[in-house]
A protein has these predicted regions:
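Conserved catalytic-core segment of NTP-binding enzymes
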Residues: 34-140
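Short, hydrophobic alpha-helical segments
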Residues: 178-183
Length: 183
C-alpha cells in the first residue's frame, strides 16, 4: 500500500485537534486492516504536525527524504528529535532505517558535502540508544529532474509519465535496494 499525502488532507489536522487519541488514529485504522498488506509506505508532507505524528505512531521504520542543502539539515535535526520523542512516548518500535538524498544536483559540490556530513552523523550514532542508531544513507540518490515535478501536474506517477527519465530510474533503484533486488 501507499498512503500518499495530498491537498485533500489540508483540513484533517484541524479536524483531529479535538479528538481524543488523535496521535494514534492512523495506527488504529491500519491495525484493523493489517492483513491486507505486506508493507505500507506513508508519504508525509514536510512538516511535523499532527498528520506526520500519526504516521510516525503507525510506523515501524522511517525513511527520511532529504534535500542536500543547509536548511534541510536543520529540518532533519528537528525530525530526528520528533522521532526520538515518538519512540520514547508513543511507539517503541519506531526506528529510522535510512536517509534518501533527493533533488541531488550532481554538478554542484554542496550535495556531496552534505552526503559526507550525513554519512559521518549516521556512523557516529552506531551503537547508541537513539532511534537512528541503525540508519544508513541509501546508496543511491534521486537526481534533480524536471520530469519528477511535471508528472503530478498530469495526474501521473513518474513511471506513467516518463518511465525512462533519470527520476524514474533513480526511484526504481531505490525500490530495488529496499526490496533486496540485484540490479
Amino acid at each position: 500500500w501507499l498512503l500518499a499525502a495530498n491537498i485533500n488532507l489540508v483540513g484533517a489536522e484541524t479536524e483531529l485537534v479535538s479528538v481524543v487519541g488523535r496521535e494514534i488514529i492512523l495506527r488504529e485504522a491500519m491495525q484493523a486492516s493489517q492483513d491486507r498488506f505486506d508493507f505500507c509506505l506513508i508519504d508525509c508532507a514536510p512538516s511535523l504536525g499532527l498528520l506526520s505524528l500519526n504516521a510516525l505512531a503507525a510506523s515501524q521504520e522511517v525513511l527520511i527524504p532529504l534535500q542536500p542543502h543547509f536548511l534541510a539539515l536543520q529540518g532533519f535535526g528537528k525530525l530526528l528529535q520528533t522521532v526520538d520523542l515518538v519512540n520514547r512516548r508513543i511507539n517503541r518500535d519506531l526506528k529510522v532505517s535510512g536517509v534518501l538524498l533527493c533533488m541531488f544536483d550532481t554538478r554542484a559540490s554542496l550535495p556531496n558535502e552534505v552526503r559526507a556530513d550525513i554519512e559521518r552523523f549516521l556512523e557516529n550514532a552506531r551503537g547508541s540508544a537513539c532511534a537512528w542508531a541503525d540508519a544508513r544513507l541509501v546508496p543511491t540518490f534521486i537526481r534533480r529532474n524536471i520530469k519528477l515535478a511535471e508528472a503530478p501536474s498530469y495526474g501521473q506517477t513518474i513511471f506513467e509519465y516518463d518511465p525512462t527519465c533519470n527520476g524514474a530510474e533513480d526511484y526504481r533503484r531505490v525500490a530495488q535496494f529496499f526490496l533486496g533486488v540485484e540490479t
